[in-house]
Amino acid sequence: MAKQSMKARDVKRAKIASKYAEKRNALKTVINDPKASDEERWEAVLKLQQLPRDASPTRQRNRCRITGRPHGFLRKFGMSRIKVREMAMRGEIPGLKKASW
């Protein structure tokens, strides 16, 4: 299991990213706008750099809901491959069964 501090850090990053999402998108549109002047672009770049690092959504890590494991994460289930397999073997995930051919 992942440390509680690692899980809490990811939750904090998600909150910060959602808080600054609109501001980041507005600055990104100015930066990528071909009609914007160089001064406007440069100001937008500087403002974007002033935002907290955790405001970037790429700093978030997909983690298993149950264990907090960061690797082997399956987006469809929101869990790690290990927990998906355990729950599938117990029949706790409807419609999921072991493959056999």
Curated annotation (Swiss-Prot):
Keyword tags: Ribonucleoprotein, Ribosomal protein, RNA-binding, rRNA-binding
Domain of life: Bacteria
Molecular function as annotated in GO: rRNA binding; structural constituent of ribosome
GO (cellular component) term, any one: small ribosomal subunit
One GO-annotated biological process of the protein: translation
Ribonucleoprotein keyword on record: yes
PROSITE patterns named in the record: RIBOSOMAL_S14 (PS00527)
InterPro entries: Ribosomal_uS14, Ribosomal_uS14_bac/plastid, Ribosomal_uS14_CS
TM ranges: none
HAMAP family assigned: Ribosomal_uS14_1 (MF_00537)
Function: Binds 16S rRNA, required for the assembly of 30S particles and may also be responsible for determining the conformation of the 16S rRNA at the A site.
Family note: Belongs to the universal ribosomal protein uS14 family.
Oligomeric and partner information: Part of the 30S ribosomal subunit. Contacts proteins S3 and S10.
Protein name per UniProt: Small ribosomal subunit protein uS14
Organism: Idiomarina loihiensis (strain ATCC BAA-735 / DSM 15497 / L2-TR)
